């Protein structure tokens, strides 16, 4: 089996460019990817004799058993299966698409939805209580491996990850650097202010498996 990693640049609808990493697995035995009972797995993306593993937009590992990304679509399902996910934390208010729900059901993945509006206004308040509820789910190792995502994987996802970093005792400079790496030119002062004043004193437990904590 040979892994070939390709990075491509694609233009989004709004004119911005983003990078996707496509991992091609050559010489794949298709029988390996059959569902129980011998039926073909409908969520595997196979072209010829190659299996294409395409991460979602803005995909990255946050910590042991924690991942982040933009909204995954059917092209990303094969890649997500390799993560062995138990849970997804979804931070948008819109209903989850039926195709995504079917993917979760077929893979035994639990969905936690904390609907946060995707406001573009600079001074709109982020709902503190929803971030807290999402953070509690995130800290529970029974839910790992877990994927956090919103629409683009920038602002709402960035705020939740930033609050996790604060709990891990990261300095604000490092928290903001990570946030800005994903938000880029779309970084919002209101998001960074929210992370700065977010009170983590009510959270007393950080799983020992977390590798990015300052202990």
Curated annotation (Swiss-Prot):
- Name the top EC class: hydrolase
Q: Which residues form the Tyrosine-protein phosphatase domain?
A: 58-209
| Family assignment from sequence similarity | Belongs to the protein-tyrosine phosphatase family. Atypical dual-specificity phosphatase Siw14-like subfamily.
Annotated segments matching region WPD loop important for active site topology:
114-126
Q: Which reaction does it catalyse?
A: 5-diphospho-1D-myo-inositol 1,2,3,4,6-pentakisphosphate + H2O = 1D-myo-inositol hexakisphosphate + phosphate + H(+); 1,5-bis(diphospho)-1D-myo-inositol 2,3,4,6-tetrakisphosphate + H2O = 1-diphospho-1D-myo-inositol 2,3,4,5,6-pentakisphosphate + phosphate + 2 H(+); 3,5-bis(diphospho)-1D-myo-inositol 1,2,4,6-tetrakisphosphate + H2O = 3-diphospho-1D-myo-inositol 1,2,4,5,6-pentakisphosphate + phosphate + 2 H(+); 6-diphospho-1D-myo-inositol pentakisphosphate + H2O = 1D-myo-inositol hexakisphosphate + phosphate + H(+)
Instruction: Note how its activity is modulated.
Output: Inhibited by manganese, calcium and zinc ions but not magnesium ions.
Q: Which residues form the active site?
A: 150
Q: Under which name does UniProt file this protein?
A: Inositol diphosphatase DSP1
Function, please? Cleaves the beta-phosphate at the 5-position of soluble inositol pyrophosphates. Has highest activity on 5-diphosphoinositol 1,2,3,4,6-pentakisphosphate (5-InsP(7)), 1,5-bis-diphosphoinositol 2,3,4,6-tetrakisphosphate (1,5-InsP(8)) and 3,5-InsP(8), but has weak activity against 1-diphosphoinositol 2,3,4,5,6-pentakisphosphate (1-InsP(7)). Dephosphorylates the phosphoinositides PI(3,4,5)P3, PI(3,5)P2, but not PI(3)P, PI(3,4)P2 or PI(4,5)P2. Possesses phosphotyrosine phosphatase activity in vitro, and can hydrolyze para-nitrophenyl phosphate, O-methylfluorescein phosphate, polyphosphate and ATP.
What the entry lists under Gene3D superfamilies is as follows: Protein tyrosine phosphatase superfamily (3.90.190.10)
Q: Where is this site: Transition state stabilizer?
A: 156
One MF term in GO for this entry? Answer: inositol-3,5-bisdiphosphate-2,3,4,6-tetrakisphosphate 5-diphosphatase activity
The coiled-coil segments of this chain are none
């Amino acid at each position: 089996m040979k892994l070939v990693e390709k990075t491509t640049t694609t233009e989004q609808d709004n004119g911005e460019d983003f990078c996707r990493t496509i991992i091609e697995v050559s010489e794949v035995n298709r029988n390996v990817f059959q569902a129980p009972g011998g039926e073909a797995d409908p969520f595997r993306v196979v072209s010829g004799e190659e299996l294409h593993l395409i991460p979602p937009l803005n995909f990255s590992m946050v910590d042991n058993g924690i991942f982040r990304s933009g909204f995954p679509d059917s092209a990303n399902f094969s890649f997500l299966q390799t993560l062995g996910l138990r849970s997804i934390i979804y931070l948008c208010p819109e209903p989850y698409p039926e195709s995504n729900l079917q993917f979760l059901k077929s893979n035994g993945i639990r969905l936690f939805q904390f609907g946060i509006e995707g406001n573009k206004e600079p001074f709109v308040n982020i709902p503190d209580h929803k971030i807290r509820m999402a953070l509690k789910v995130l800290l529970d190792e029974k839910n790992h491996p877990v994927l956090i995502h919103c629409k683009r994987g920038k602002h709402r996802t960035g705020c939740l990850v930033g609050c996790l970093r604060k709990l891990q005792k990261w300095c604000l400079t490092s928290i903001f650097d990570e946030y800005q790496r994903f938000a880029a030119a779309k970084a919002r002062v209101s998001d960074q202010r929210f992370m700065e004043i977010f009170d983590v004193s009510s959270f007393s437990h950080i799983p020992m498996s977390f590798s990015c904590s300052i202990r």
